[in-house]
Amino acid sequence: MSTELKRINRKYDYFDPENPSRTIIMSCDVDQDSAYDIIEIISYINEFDDDNEANVKDYIRKPIKMIINSYGGSVYDGFAIIGVMETSKTPIHTYCYGSAMSMGFLIFVSGHYRYAHRMCTFMYHECLDQPIYDKLTTLRENIDETKRIMDVYDKQLLAKTTLKRKQLDDSKKAKFDWYMDSVQAMKYKITDEVI
């Protein structure tokens, strides 16, 4: 395991062999560097807990606390983080302070238990794509891929909340960013608790 974290808060000792920190602060864009750091930390804590579960009688896994304040970023890197979160035997509790927007929003709702500060803001919108100045075939392929990842995103969001497909589709048709506060987050089961 590397101890040189690229984007995540370095004040915590995530790789302490006796007592690794269980607080991850994601106050950055979702990109390859932040995804690498988060995946490495979650994997290390799971290995630590697996070892202790096998060797320490009545060992109980303590949750990982993931604090999120992010405008989002790369969908593919976000999906990588979510994949590791979903397969983590150690529970991951997500906390939103500030904002969880776009891919940051989907990472937040993918926590095993979710807390939202009363002043936080969530935002859902249609996946954004970079303009491509290329052949028509390439443009079509890019559109198809954007539709596919939007469908994956929406299915995850619908599975984790009480939001309805029509609400998401209406938001996309109206071409607006859908902002939600903590009260709406409770209404749609985006969060389990407001703190």
Sequence positions of predicted segments:
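Terminal-region recognition feature
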Residues: 1-195
